[in-house]
Amino acid sequence: MERASCLLLLLLPLVHVSATTPEPCELDDEDFRCVCNFSEPQPDWSEAFQCVSAVEVEIHAGGLNLEPFLKRVDADADPRQYADTVKALRVRRLTVGAAQVPAQLLVGALRVLAYSRLKELTLEDLKITGTMPPLPLEATGLALSSLRLRNVSWATGRSWLAELQQWLKPGLKVLSIAQAHSPAFSCEQVRAFPALTSLDLSDNPGLGERGLMAALCPHKFPAIQNLALRNTGMETPTGVCAALAAAGVQPHSLDLSHNSLRATVNPSAPRCMWSSALNSLNLSFAGLEQVPKGLPAKLRVLDLSCNRLNRAPQPDELPEVDNLTLDGNPFLVPGTALPHEGSMNSGVVPACARSTLSVGVSGTLVLLQGARGFA
């Protein structure tokens, strides 16, 4: 039991337990999902023992600084002595949130989790302090299929992804990075992600097309099939096309929804040829008053819903497309017109206005579905 206690101390720092719940941790009746909210200044961390049998574990640390844990556990201990105990845990999905975490403690937790059957890891609202030590020669990486990061800051700046990557096995399939403090990476340090098929950079409004070029390290994401760029400050489809071409990224599905896109293309900008692999493009909620220039010549799916189109697109304005979605545009709704300049009326169909409330929920939810098929 003492050994298990040490393990949990490494994994502690979950989400949104009801304010009326007297205990910090709650395990459902099926022993499937366990949620802890340690909001007290001096929480009783032992309550987390309830989560030992759960498949999904969420731990929210209430913004506490976890540095005192370094005095209570040996983060440098050889985790192989815990291997059998860790393998017996049922946890497959782990969320850790709202804490200030020393990098040494994070590394200690990752070393222990490397012996677990964990497949999906979410880190959110964390401040990582200090630098991450290099991976020891005898250490094994964490075999994740999905890694999701939201509002995580790193003391190491642009090199954080490369430092974190060394603690992961190369089989990562889904990567989501939202509200990043440094969305650009140190590309010369980042190794390739050979198995990564879904990359979600949504909810980074300051990214922009120049930032996208810096984030898509050339030839480091060779297997990308799904790329989500919701609410990332993109300006034109052509600009995105150029960034993808420069990085050698050829997604099958591209989500540019919830960006304020311009329909016209800069005449001085070179023409960009989209990859023939792209067959699905989402341009919904983009404020478009007309079909933008520079779209791929052929698409299987094109979503132009919830824009500001005041007339049906002409055939010569559209690419060859099998599945076109135009729902929620003013020309389809009687009595809805485009706003005049300075008007308080947004010209947005009411149903679409309600849907924009979900903009904070990024494309991650869709992308993560592909990573849920673990054994």
Swiss-Prot record:
N- and O- glycosylated. O-glycosylated with a core 1 or possibly core 8 glycan. It comes from the Eukaryota. GO terms for biological process: apoptotic process; cell surface pattern recognition receptor signaling pathway; cell surface receptor signaling pathway; cellular response to diacyl bacterial lipopeptide; cellular response to lipopolysaccharide; cellular response to lipoteichoic acid; cellular response to molecule of bacterial origin; cellular response to triacyl bacterial lipopeptide. SUPFAM superfamilies: L domain-like (SSF52058). Keywords: Cell membrane, Disulfide bond, Glycoprotein, Golgi apparatus, GPI-anchor, Immunity, Inflammatory response, Innate immunity, Leucine-rich repeat, Lipoprotein, Membrane, Repeat, Secreted, Signal. GO terms for cellular component: endosome membrane; external side of plasma membrane; extracellular exosome; extracellular region; extracellular space; Golgi apparatus; lipopolysaccharide receptor complex; membrane raft. A lipid is attached at residue 345 (GPI-anchor amidated asparagine). Detected on macrophages (at protein level). Expressed strongly on the surface of monocytes and weakly on the surface of granulocytes; also expressed by most tissue macrophages. GO terms for molecular function: lipopolysaccharide binding; lipopolysaccharide immune receptor activity; lipoteichoic acid binding; molecular carrier activity; opsonin receptor activity; peptidoglycan immune receptor activity. Disulfide bonds join 25-36, 34-51, 187-217, 241-272. Induction: The expression in monocytes is highly induced by 27-hydroxycholesterol, priming monocytes/macrophages such that LPS-mediated inflammatory reaction is accelerated. Secretion of soluble CD14 is also enhanced. LRR repeats lie at residues 54-82, 83-118, 119-144, 145-172, 173-196, 197-224, 225-251, 252-278, 279-299, 300-321, 322-349. Residues 290-375 are annotated as: Required for response to bacterial lipopolysaccharide (LPS). Glycans are attached at residues 37, 151, 282, 323, 336. Residues 346-375 form a propeptide. It is a lipid-anchor; GPI-anchor. Coreceptor for bacterial lipopolysaccharide. In concert with LBP, binds to monomeric lipopolysaccharide and delivers it to the LY96/TLR4 complex, thereby mediating the innate immune response to bacterial lipopolysaccharide (LPS). Acts via MyD88, TIRAP and TRAF6, leading to NF-kappa-B activation, cytokine secretion and the inflammatory response. The C-terminal leucine-rich repeat (LRR) region is required for responses to smooth LPS. This is Monocyte differentiation antigen CD14.
